[in-house]
Amino acid sequence: MTTANVEQKVKNIIADQLGVGEDEIKITSSFIEDLGADSLDIVELVMAMEEEFEVEIPDEEAENIKTVQDAVNYITTHKK
């Protein structure tokens, strides 16, 4: 899976979970500051990404995933 594919799937998950348009989601978007997510939204996003990409994201790692780019980087690095 290419980085572009991962990025698109991450954006799809964010759009579904947060109810924002994909056109509002930039690679540099912060989940909390730019997309209006709260802590529960972040947990749900992480769970959705774990399921979609079949990757485990430990809580201490999830705390460092603050932007779309962070999520894409983590998934492309840790995906089997």
Curated annotation (Swiss-Prot):
Q: Which residues form the Carrier domain?
A: 4-79
Q: Which family does it belong to?
A: Belongs to the acyl carrier protein (ACP) family.
Q: Which gene encodes it?
A: acpP
Task: Quote the protein name from its UniProt record.
Answer: Acyl carrier protein
Q: What is its main location?
A: cytoplasm
PROSITE patterns in the cross-refs: CARRIER, PHOSPHOPANTETHEINE
- What PANTHER family does its record include? ACYL CARRIER PROTEIN, CARRIER DOMAIN-CONTAINING PROTEIN
Q: Which GO terms describe its molecular function?
A: acyl binding; acyl carrier activity
Q: Say which species the protein is native to.
A: Anaeromyxobacter sp. (strain Fw109-5)
Q: Which HAMAP family does this UniProt record tie to the protein?
A: Acyl_carrier
